[in-house]
């Protein structure tokens, strides 16, 4: 890693020399000497990096160099910080403070020179080759698309495993467990993902769950992870007992499919404890595990272990070729020949093939490919894992600036889902990113990440709400760890986590020069001068540590770049925090007691990211527009006085997302234009909201018109706007790239913009609109296709809305999949050919409900909270032969269900809850449900008995009845009047 950081250091030294800062402190001669020494050392680093694998002395030498480089960087940091302070205070060279500073730094420089002389002299003993290291030109940003690579050679294995899982019949109480065994990098997880996503698995099981286990087989952690996977949301901290109960409720009667990926646990008792909780599932539930250890297969498996073999030479070549030649129509025959020789060395291991393919896609000279083929790394001693030489080769052929960025990823635990933007901010904090012309560091970091992804170092990419998350294969993580530890010493960049006071004292004693510290739990007591001891700290993570007051000594951390205070109870920040002139990121996410920031916040001259989401700020700090480096500002509260107005945003080159609140304080359109939103090309998400009191309705239309965003915008929210119409810029040209729109509380807008013309719009949510709106699109005859990309449509609170479009015409809503209609009592559904999920909330008249039959492709239907309907029309379920899931809840006056239920031949789950007046289930209606596997009836107090036809539903595997007092006795096992109707069902659960 040292060679890449040296380039950053040399850039800084050049800046100091050219900027004559060395003259200010009298260190120009020393700076030039340092630059010369590092340049000489840098010339041999490429050779040293390769030879350290064989020679421990060279590895130790690189560690010493790494330490020295960071110490010099600290000195430069101090000089830059002091220079800024002197400029602000208008101090001269002969001021006592200047003299004192120069004396202290001069002493450190002298010691540093002696260290570097020794390091430079020691390098002569190794006879290292000098090489010219060219800085890589800026990489192209255009055309990069995240795609899932094609999998080769595992179709047969996928088919075999799917058949085992589907055809397996277990007559014991134990849930069958199928282990997949194979060495690291062989593709066990990839194969498990193929099985998990197989259509046959989706159709066979009621519930699919995926959990990554890794080294930590902790029952509480795993149960929590399983529950979170089922519910699709994070849980707070819970004790084991309530977690076990919650999981059993979720699995009860379900034919679930659970994947436990990357299992290392060899403790039989731990598995027995978890298995006991998982028994509750319905007959046919199955568990699939992946592991490298055969012993684990015998401990956990109940089915015969599935041994995964190596890929064939042909499939391995296809995998390599996919990455190395990347859609090229013409390829060099010689490169093809060398490539096949390299593939032979991969030994049929997919991870090796795709990683080397990712490496060679950036190399087109025959000599470069031959260098990889003939590298000595193939001949180094290895353990049983044959993939390591390929991974090491890939690392050593990375460009300089990518090596340390990749190795730094070792600070994250294995199997961590890492946020891309967070990682880039940490790279910046440690000065890993080399500036390139006029490119912003964030863009440089994005290019580095993209290239590492293309080289197959990152996987399992997931994009949510505009943010990218990813993981690293555990063998790739092992590689990062080995490369990172080779460059680190006690002067480590590693993330040290503090769990208690004892940890704190140990770190204070042994790691005073740590660069990264995180508090994983609250530290009950600390000295106000706590942070003074960590003079080199660059990253400080205090998130969710229950700090109520931040020690003012944090202001002494002059090298601090990244400060995470998210999730704490702090009410205010110390003024001394504003002395941190190198601070780049201040994360205050979810600090729910924080109402204001220090008035001197604008002095944080290096601040690039200010995260304020879910902070109840009543105002912004004054003159935030002075933070010209600021790129991320998630939240802005408009003020009425100068220094607090929208004009503060004018010169900020913001990116990402911003929420602007209290726009009612903007007096006119001229003031709104000062925000200069139309020039912010890197802003992808914009939320604008007004507060209801003190509204100036006549001005609000002009204000919103003046807040026109840049055409690059992707997400737009307008909340509680009081004007009588939405702006003209909400048309095709300005919002041509928008994928999601939310309009809420705009009760005076009598008509809606032509959303149907937006070519990229995928999600549209309209809430609490005007009583005058009758149609989402109220234009004349439609000749062009409308809403070409819309997949989700949520509409609520439009009491006179009659439908989607007044006029019919060309094909409309061609890809719409999900609809939610709430509190729109007059709404009638048109004929739509692609809708699969529908939720209806609130009142709806008979015509509206019967028009559901126009949605013939529905697979899921939920009807909630209709307090007036007493029956559902027979026409309602006509044409819904594709329906798989039906839920009817909180229809408090519903007395009966239609017999047309019988037409739902593919229905698998019927869920009826809180229908207090329901007296019976239709005899004829239930008999026709030939595919039904699950029936839930809850809190239907008037339900007197179960229909006779229930006993003919041979596919029914799970029945759950709760809160139906008249059924409890009738369904009593063996003696109840209705027991014969349900005795054939494998899983029956009846609760009071």
Swiss-Prot record:
Molecular function via GO = ADP binding; ATP binding
Q: So what does mutating residue 173 to K actually do?
A: In susceptible haplotype
Q: What does the UniProt record report as the effect of altering residue 775 to F in this chain?
A: In susceptible haplotype
Q: Which residues cross the membrane?
A: none
Report the record's Gene Ontology biological process terms.
Answer: defense response to other organism
Consequence when changing residue 847 to R: In susceptible haplotype
Q: What's its job?
A: Disease resistance protein. Resistance proteins guard the plant against pathogens that contain an appropriate avirulence protein via a direct or indirect interaction with this avirulence protein. That triggers a defense system which restricts the pathogen growth.
InterPro entries reported in the protein's UniProt record? Apaf_helical, Leu-rich_rpt, Leu-rich_rpt_typical-subtyp, LRR_dom_sf, LRR_R13L1-DRL21, NB-ARC, P-loop_NTPase, RX-like_CC
Q: What else is known?
A: Belongs to a four-gene family located at the same locus. Although the four genes are expressed in the resistant haplotype, only RGA2 confers the resistance to P.infestans. In the susceptible haplotype, RGA1 and RGA3 are likely to be pseudogenes created by deletions and mutations, while RGA2 also contains several modifications.
Per the UniProt record, the source organism is: Solanum bulbocastanum
What is the protein name stated in its UniProt record? Putative disease resistance protein RGA3
* Signals that turn on the gene: Constitutively expressed.
Q: Which family does it belong to?
A: Belongs to the disease resistance NB-LRR family.
């Amino acid at each position: 890693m040292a060679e890449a950081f040296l380039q950053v250091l040399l850039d800084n030294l050049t800046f100091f020399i050219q900027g004559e800062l060395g003259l200010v402190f009298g260190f120009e001669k020393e700076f030039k000497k340092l630059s010369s020494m590092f340049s000489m050392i840098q010339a041999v680093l490429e050779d040293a990096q390769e030879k350290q694998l064989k020679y421990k002395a060279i590895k130790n030498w690189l560690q010493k160099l790494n330490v020295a480089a960071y110490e010099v960087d600290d000195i430069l940091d101090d000089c830059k910080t002091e220079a800024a302070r002197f400029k602000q205070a208008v101090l001269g060279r002969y001021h006592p403070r200047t003299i004192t500073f120069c004396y202290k730094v001069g002493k450190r420089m002298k010691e540093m020179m002696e260290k570097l002389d020794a390091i430079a002299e020691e390098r002569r003993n190794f006879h290292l080759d000098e090489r010219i290291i060219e800085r890589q030109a800026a990489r192209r940003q255009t055309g990069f698309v995240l795609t899932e690579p094609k999998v080769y050679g595992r179709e047969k294995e996928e088919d075999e495993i799917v058949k085992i899982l589907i055809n397996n019949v277990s007559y014991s109480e134990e849930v069958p467990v199928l282990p997949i065994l194979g060495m690291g990098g062989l593709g066990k997880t990839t194969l498990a993902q193929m099985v998990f996503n197989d259509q046959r698995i989706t159709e066979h099981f009621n519930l699919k769950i995926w959990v990554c286990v890794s080294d930590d087989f902790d029952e509480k952690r795993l149960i929590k992870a399983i529950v979170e996977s089922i519910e699709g949301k994070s849980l707070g901290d819970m004790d084991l007992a309530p977690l076990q109960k919650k999981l059993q409720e979720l699995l009860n009667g379900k034919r679930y499919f659970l994947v436990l990926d990357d299992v290392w646990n060899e403790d039989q008792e731990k598995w027995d404890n978890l298995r006991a909780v998982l028994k509750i599932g319905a007959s046919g539930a199955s568990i699939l595990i992946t592991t490298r250890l055969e012993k684990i297969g015998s401990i956990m498996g109940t089915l015969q272990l599935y041994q995964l073999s190596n890929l064939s030479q042909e499939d391995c070549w296809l995998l390599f070729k996919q990455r190395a030649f990347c859609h090229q129509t013409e390829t060099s025959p010689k490169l093809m020949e060398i490539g096949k020789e390299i593939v032979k060395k991969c030994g049929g291991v997919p991870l090796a093939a795709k990683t080397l393919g990712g490496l060679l896609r950036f190399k087109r000279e025959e000599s470069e490919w031959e260098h990889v083929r003939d590298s000595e790394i193939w001949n180094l001693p290895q353990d049983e894992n044959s993939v390591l030489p390929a991974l090491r080769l890939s690392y050593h052929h990375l460009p300089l600036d990518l090596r340390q960025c990749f190795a730094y990823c070792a600070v994250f635990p294995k199997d961590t889902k890492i946020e891309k933007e967070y990682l880039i901010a940490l790279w910046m904090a440690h000065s890993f990113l080399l500036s390139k012309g006029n490119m912003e560091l964030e863009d440089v970091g994005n290019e580095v990440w993209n290239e590492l992804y293309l080289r197959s170092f990152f996987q399992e990419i997931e994009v949510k709400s505009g943010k990218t998350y990813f993981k690293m294969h555990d063998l790739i993580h092992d590689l990062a760890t080995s490369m990172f530890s080779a460059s680190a010493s006690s002067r480590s960049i590693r993330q040290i986590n503090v769990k208690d006071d004892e940890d704190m004292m140990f770190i204070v004693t042994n790691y005073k020069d740590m660069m990264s510290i995180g508090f994983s739990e609250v530290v009950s007591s600390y000295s106000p001068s706590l942070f003074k001891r960590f003079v080199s700290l660059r990253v400080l993570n205090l998130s969710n540590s229950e700090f109520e007051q931040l020690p003012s000594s944090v202001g002494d951390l002059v090298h601090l770049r990244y400060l995470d205070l998210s999730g704490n109870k702090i009410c205010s920040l110390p003024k001394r925090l504003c002395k941190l002139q190198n601070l780049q990121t201040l994360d205050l996410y979810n600090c729910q007691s924080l109402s204001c920031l220090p008035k001197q916040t604008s002095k944080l001259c290096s601040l690039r990211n200010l995260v304020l989401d879910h902070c109840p700020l009543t105002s912004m700090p004054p003159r935030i527009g002075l933070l010209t480096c600021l790129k991320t500002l998630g939240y802005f509260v408009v003020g009425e006085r100068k220094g607090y107005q929208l004009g503060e945003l004018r010169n900020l080159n913001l990116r990402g997302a911003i929420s602007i609140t209290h726009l009612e304080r903007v007096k006119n359109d001229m003031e709104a234009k000062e925000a200069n939103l139309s020039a912010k090309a890197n802003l992808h998400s914009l939320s604008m909201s007004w507060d209801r009191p003190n509204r100036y309705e006549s001005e609000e239309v002009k204000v919103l018109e003046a807040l026109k965003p840049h055409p690059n915008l992707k997400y737009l929210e307008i909340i509680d706007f009081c004007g009588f119409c939405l702006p003209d810029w909400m048309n095709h040209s300005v919002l041509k790239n928008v994928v999601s729109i939310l309009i809420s509380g705009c009760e005076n807008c009598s008509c809606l913009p032509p959303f149907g013309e937006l070519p990229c719009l995928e999600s549209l949510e309209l809430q609490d609109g005007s009583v005058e709106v009758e149609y989402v699109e109220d234009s004349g005859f439609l000749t062009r296709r409308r809403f070409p990309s819309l997949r989700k449509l949520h509409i609520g609170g439009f009491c006179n809305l009659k439908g989607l479009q007044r006029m019919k015409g060309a094909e409309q809503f061609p890809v719409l999949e999900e609809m939610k209609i709430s509190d729109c009592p007059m709404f009638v559904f048109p004929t739509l050919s692609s809708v699969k999920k529908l939720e209806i909330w609130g009142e709806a008249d008979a015509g509206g409900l019967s028009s559901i039959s126009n949605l013939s492709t529905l697979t899921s239907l939920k009807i909630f909270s209709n307090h007036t309907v007493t029956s559902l029309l027979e026409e309602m379920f006509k044409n819904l032969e594709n329906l798989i899931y039906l839920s009817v809840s909180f229809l408090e006056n519903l007395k009966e269900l239609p017999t047309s239920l019988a037409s739902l031949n593919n229905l698998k789950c019927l869920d009826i809850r809180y229908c207090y007046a329901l007296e019976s289930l239709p005899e004829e209606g239930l008999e026709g449900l030939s595919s039904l596997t699950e029936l839930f009836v809850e809190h239907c107090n008037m339900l007197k008995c179960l229909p006779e036809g229930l006993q003919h539903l041979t596919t029914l595997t799970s029945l759950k009845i709760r809160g139906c007092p008249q059924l409890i006795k009738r369904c009593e096992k063996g003696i109840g009047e209705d027991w014969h109707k349900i005795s054939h069902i494998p899983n029956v659960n009846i609760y009071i």
